[in-house]
């Protein structure tokens, strides 16, 4: 865990109001925040490097080289330091990608993003997995989402991207458009084409895609709620009829609304847990409000 409060330190550049610094700071905040989807933390060295880039003292390419050199000099590392290395390297790469304007809506672009994020980190960067996977999820009490069969990944990718490309947003309200984008993100994430790094690659791809619609992405969502983002994707793709659990995009829609429309939905991971008793919570809130109003009458 880094000693410095990276959120506070990077937020200061946004408060200064300089467009170039603001854009760079937002990219870094998103990049660092996204490491939380895999439980990773960045180092203080990464934060110092990010600040120098934001201040214009070094380029993003120089920032990446510094991070690589930093870890090349540290020959002996603990497991925690190896995880921090991954977080630092990938954060710098995300910041670079988010700073680039170029984008093409295609499966090839998504694979390219994954390769650029994880080259040298994962041996399979940018490659479609060659085996089926399961992942135990906290939000599902240890159960897993059913991901696409590895034999059909390419065809499924082509279908989902072709369907989205033909979809017309004309005539939709802004809320309807955001809900559709959330559903598309959910669908391609469920394919899970890569062995690792799917959620981070999905996030970067979707941010760049949504910017082509003129959206201004609120970095706070990924900065503070990356694990919520992953859990919301999980809940959007999980059914267990015996337990009365149905797939729902409502949690993901709230995240996307905060991300794109500057709404302020309360994003709590516990609300998504399949054992969360929503009715009980609402009953408790009703009791508390009733008691509160009665107290005002005396």
Model-derived regions, located:
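FIC/Doc superfamily catalytic core
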Residues: 1-298
């Amino acid at each position: 865990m880094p000693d410095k409060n990276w959120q506070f330190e990077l937020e200061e550049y946004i408060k200064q109001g300089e467009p170039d610094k603001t854009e760079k700071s937002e990219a870094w905040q998103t990049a660092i925040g996204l490491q939380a989807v895999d439980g990773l933390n960045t180092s203080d060295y990464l934060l110092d490097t990010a600040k120098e880039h934001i201040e214009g003292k070094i380029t993003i390419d120089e920032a990446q080289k510094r991070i690589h050199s930093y870890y090349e000099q540290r020959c002996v590392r603990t497991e925690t330091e190896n995880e921090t290395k991954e977080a630092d390297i990938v954060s710098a790469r995300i910041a670079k990608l988010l700073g680039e304007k170029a984008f093409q809506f295609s499966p090839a672009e998504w694979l390219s993003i994954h390769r650029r994020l994880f080259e040298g980190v994962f041996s399979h960067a940018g490659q479609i997995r060659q085996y089926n996977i399961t992942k135990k999820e906290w939000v599902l009490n240890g159960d897993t989402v059913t991901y696409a069969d590895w034999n059909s990944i390419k065809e499924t990718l082509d279908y989902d991207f072709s369907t989205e490309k033909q979809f017309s947003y004309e005539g939709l309200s802004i809320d309807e458009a955001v809900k559709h984008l959330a559903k598309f993100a959910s669908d391609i994430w469920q394919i899970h084409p890569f062995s690792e790094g799917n959620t981070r690659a999905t996030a970067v791809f979707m941010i760049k895609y949504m910017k082509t619609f003129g959206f201004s992405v609120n970095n706070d969502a990924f900065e503070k709620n990356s694990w919520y983002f992953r859990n919301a994707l999980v809940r959007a793709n999980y059914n267990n009829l015996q337990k009365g659990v149905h797939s729902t995009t409502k949690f993901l829609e709230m995240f996307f609304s905060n991300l794109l429309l500057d709404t302020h939905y309360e994003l709590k991971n516990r609300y998504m847990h399949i054992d969360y008793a929503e009715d009980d919570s609402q009953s408790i809130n009703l009791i508390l409000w009733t008691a509160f109003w009665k107290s005002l009458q005396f």
